[in-house]
């Protein structure tokens, strides 16, 4: 369909200007003027109708098909977007909270497992230490019993041995008759050794083996002294005191004179 351009419209209006064409009104027929004016008015009306149809078709194509606002509740697009964002944010928040709860439960479970393992390890360690201490006590007890005859040289060692023996008896480590008899026998031997230490000169200052050797020499000295003192002729040769020296000279003298 033809559309008027700006220049054509002005020229057409100039052709129908009554001021310029007043002299030719009478010459042109009246029906010709009416036909031209009706043609111009129809053309304008048709052009406006075409523009209205195009604009209505364009909006009808864009709005109902691409953006169906009528189908939306309220027909408000920003409100719909805001509600969608809020629902999406709530879903993300709830999922994040669930993940945090799962992580906390897992951490609590792991911590409980660690505590249980530590308690089990501590109990096992205590049992091992107690068993080792019992073994050490038994070994110390056996060592004291075995060495009571050779290392109880002074009063303190003898008292410690007797105290330990009483402690073992109260604990019930030796409850059979044989062990009780052996313990009593050891106690009697320790008492006699203590008495012998007090009789032998310097017996409390040496160990058991040295003390027993000195006791043998001291007994020989006493025998020689008794023999010499009992003789009427040799009493002046009898030794007066035991000084730990060799008594061979006195024995030779006694055998030679007797």
Curated annotation (Swiss-Prot):
GO molecular-function term, one example from the UniProt record: DNA binding
Keyword NADP: no
Intervals of motif D-box: 98-105
Description of the deletion phenotype: Strong reduction in root hair number, density and length in seedlings.
Region described as Disordered: spans on this chain: 119-178
Annotated segments matching region Helix-loop-helix motif: 187-222
Post-translational modification: Ubiquitinated. Ubiquitination leads to its subsequent degradation by the 26S proteasome.
Domain of life the protein comes from: Eukaryota
Annotated keywords: DNA-binding, Nucleus, Transcription, Transcription regulation, Ubl conjugation
Tissue expression: Expressed constitutively in roots, leaves, and flowers. Expressed in root epidermal hair cells.
Family matches, as Gene3D superfamilies: Helix-loop-helix DNA-binding domain
UniProt-listed InterPro entries: bHLH_dom (IPR011598), HLH_DNA-bd_sf (IPR036638), IND-like (IPR045843)
Residues covered by the bHLH domain: 173-222
Free-text note on domains in this protein's UniProt record: D-box [RxxLxxxN] motif functions as a recognition motif for the ubiquitination machinery.
Record protein name field: Transcription factor RSL3
